[in-house]
């Protein structure tokens, strides 16, 4: 019997996450490590679990995740979007609920580039009247 799995891709800032959803008991592994070991911060773990908690599927799936690029927050956001997309692939009736909660929307905010003649993207040198 082939393993049936659902797939979802998520991106946030410079992070990308590939999410594979399989029927199981609620094990979540990111890059071969358990979720609690991969993310040190509790907030990041909460972000990842949000779509599962909303749809009451916390212990119904085993999730395999490959996350690359960016930092902790970016990867957590990318994983959340990937899980939401994989859940919709599994059951399309979950889409309105996930969309209403904002989990189906790609956060388009990116880092603004540094401009020539400025310290940072917008930070200029202190203005001197005289």
Curated annotation (Swiss-Prot):
UniProt keyword Ribonucleoprotein, yes or no: yes
Example of a GO biological process term: translation
GO cellular component: cytosolic small ribosomal subunit
InterPro entries cross-referenced by the UniProt entry: Ribosomal_Su5_D2-typ_SF (IPR020568), Ribosomal_uS9 (IPR000754), Ribosomal_uS9_bac/plastid (IPR023035), Ribosomal_uS9_CS (IPR020574), Ribsml_uS5_D2-typ_fold_subgr (IPR014721)
Disulfide bond residue pairs: none
Keywords: Ribonucleoprotein, Ribosomal protein
A GO term for molecular function: RNA binding
Keyword Iron-sulfur among UniProt keywords: no
Xref: Gene3D superfamilies: 3.30.230.10
A Pfam family: Ribosomal_S9
Family from the record: Belongs to the universal ribosomal protein uS9 family.
Protein name listed in UniProt: Small ribosomal subunit protein uS9
Gene: rpsI
């Amino acid at each position: 019997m082939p393993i049936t799995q659902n797939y979802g891709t998520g991106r946030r800032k410079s992070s990308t996450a590939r999410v594979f959803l399989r029927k199981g008991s609620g094990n979540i592994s990111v890059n071969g490590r358990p979720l609690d070991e991969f993310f040190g911060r509790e907030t990041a773990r909460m972000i990842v679990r949000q779509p599962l908690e909303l749809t009451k599927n916390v212990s119904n799936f085993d999730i395999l995740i490959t996350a690359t690029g960016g930092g902790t927050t970016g990867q957590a956001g990318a994983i959340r979007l990937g899980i939401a997309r994989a859940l919709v692939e599994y059951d399309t009736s979950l889409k309105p609920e996930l969309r209403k909660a904002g989990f189906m929307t790609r956060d388009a905010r990116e880092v603004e580039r540094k401009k020539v003649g400025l310290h940072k993207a917008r930070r200029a040198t202190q203005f001197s009247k005289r």
